[in-house]
Amino acid sequence: MASTFNPRECKLSKEEGQNYGFFLRIEKDTEGHLVRVIEKGSPAEKAGLQDGDRVLRINGVFVDKEEHMQVVDLVRKSGNAVTLLVLDGNSYEKAVKKQVDLKELGQSRQEADLRDENVAPVMNGGVETWTQPRLCYLEKQGNSYGFSLKTVQGKKGVYMTDIIPQSVAMKAGVLADDHLIEVNGENVEDASHEEVVEKVKKSGNRIVFLLVDKETEKRHSEQKIEFRREAASLKLLPHQPRIVEMKKGSSGYGFYLKAGPEQRGQIIKDIDSGSPAEAAGLKNNDLVIAVNGKSVEALDHDGVVELIKKGGDQTSLLVVDKEADSMYRLAHFSPFLYYQSQELPNGSVTEVAAPTPVPPEVSSPDPTEEVEDHKPKLCRLDKGENGYGFHLNAIRGLPGSFVKEVQKGSPADLAGLEDEDIIIEVNGVNVLDEPYEKVVDRIQSSGDNVTLLVCGKKAYEYFQAKKIPIVSSMALPLAIPADSQGMLAELEYNLHEAKERAHSTASNSSSNSEDTEL
């Protein structure tokens, strides 16, 4: 029966920095990993991909039953060339209806035998998917979480034990013999029992664990597979992000997007009664995480507004309320990862891109640590007549680029750059692992201004030692230029036009926030 269906092998190749030119997504009430939005003249179109194709294999690995983000990750990690085995939409739906073993499509028996000798065990028609690591959020009731910690002879790390029935720990999803990987976003795999106990005590009345159950750990160990924190299950977390779909009305969407000097990110304010925003379930003080499938955690106010405008008459927002934002920050996870475990509604897309992690909440500091030193800096540079006024250096054979010879009074100096600052991001893109030449090219090709996330040497070493990813939301918000102090800008646009209006230019105004009606 399988022979009546003819999958196609599409070999895609691209230049460094180029996209393949298609979206890979899942849709509600539709099975399979779908190919959508193929760009004209792109590698995807040239390779023969068609809208509605279902991806069966990536570089020979059967992926039809895999988690969507694992499939996306396989494409992303393929580098500049990838081979996709696809089946057109109609054939795929017929094959599923006839209960055809999709794994047999496109391979001979000899090929199947060879693969079976060299790949992981097969289960349910695909490469066996081990249970994911999972996040568990515990909020103390009384004096106890309801668990104990133990070490196991001959094993590295700390494990959960003595889970009290109906306790906070049990209700949060903690299991006996779970291996503790992280405490509030900090890796503890190499920590001693005493160090982990101390971290739990210091956490106060709430804590987030990244845990791996006994069977999962055993299988990963046997297969020598490393745990990927971005693949962790978020399903047990009590506060979740929300996907809000809206269509613009005659007066716009009916909400304001605001950001102030003390506010991280962009928040929803002043939702109009009876507006599309209210009908869609948007709430005041919601924090915007993504717009139309793209993370905006590293974007400034204008960047977020521009993405919403590009959506035309409809938009999809991923938002979190204060409780969810607080919990995800405590876990040091980005709410953007919520897309991993969701079947996105029609019109939403998951791009082949890495999500941005979020820093943990500020907890009670150790009095012996200089906490203020452990912050990255966001620096916006406007090019002068003689350039930006600094040199970019790198050490051969070592990752990372760093700042040298910052000229006094230059745009770099005025923006806060200092000698030895390590470049983490260029215009929101992490460049820590990129070669020196590519970092230089990113800065040079950014035009007359560039935004850099940098970290001093001492702070960088601290974050590396703690295994804490460095991201822009850890930094203080960008300073507002002196010539714009006291000005409140509001952009208002509807179906017909976009216009700007200044509310006030009074020098004694107390508001430095950005405020955009949508």
Swiss-Prot record:
Signal peptide: none
Tissue: Highly expressed in the brush border membrane of duodenal and ileal mucosa.
InterPro entries: NHER, PDZ, PDZ_6, PDZ_sf
CDD domains referenced in this protein's UniProt entry, alphabetically: PDZ_NHERF-like
Domain of life: Eukaryota
GO biological process, one term: protein localization to plasma membrane
Extent of Low complexity compositional bias: 507-518
Compartments, record wording: Membrane; Cell membrane
PTM sites of type Phosphoserine: 108, 148, 192, 250, 334, 348, 507, 509-511, 513
Region ranges (Disordered): 499-518
GO cellular component, one term: apical plasma membrane
One Pfam family in the UniProt entry: PDZ
Listed SUPFAM superfamilies: PDZ domain-like (SSF50156)
Domain comment quoted from the record: The PDZ 2 and 3 domains seem to be involved in the interaction with SLC26A3. Interaction with the C-terminus of CFTR could be mediated through independent binding of PDZ 1, 3 and 4 domains.
Family in the record: Belongs to the NHER family.
Subunit structure: Interacts with PDZK1IP1 and ABCC2. Interacts (via PDZ domains 1 and 3) with SCARB1 (C-terminal domain). Forms a heterodimeric complex with NHERF1. Interacts with AKAP2, BCR, CFTR, SLCO1A1, SLC22A12, SLC22A4, SLC22A5, NHERF2 and SLC17A1. Component of a complex, composed of PDZK1, SYNGAP1, KLHL17 and NMDA receptors. Interacts (via PDZ1 domain) directly with KLHL17; the interaction is important for integrity of actin cytoskeleton structures in neurons. Interacts (via C-terminal PDZ domain) with SLC9A3 (via C-terminal domain).
PANTHER family: NA(+)_H(+) EXCHANGE REGULATORY COFACTOR NHE-RF3-RELATED, PDZ DOMAIN CONTAINING PROTEIN
Protein name: Na(+)/H(+) exchange regulatory cofactor NHE-RF3
Annotated source species: Oryctolagus cuniculus (Rabbit)
Source lineage: Eukaryota, Metazoa, Chordata, Craniata, Vertebrata
Originating gene: PDZK1
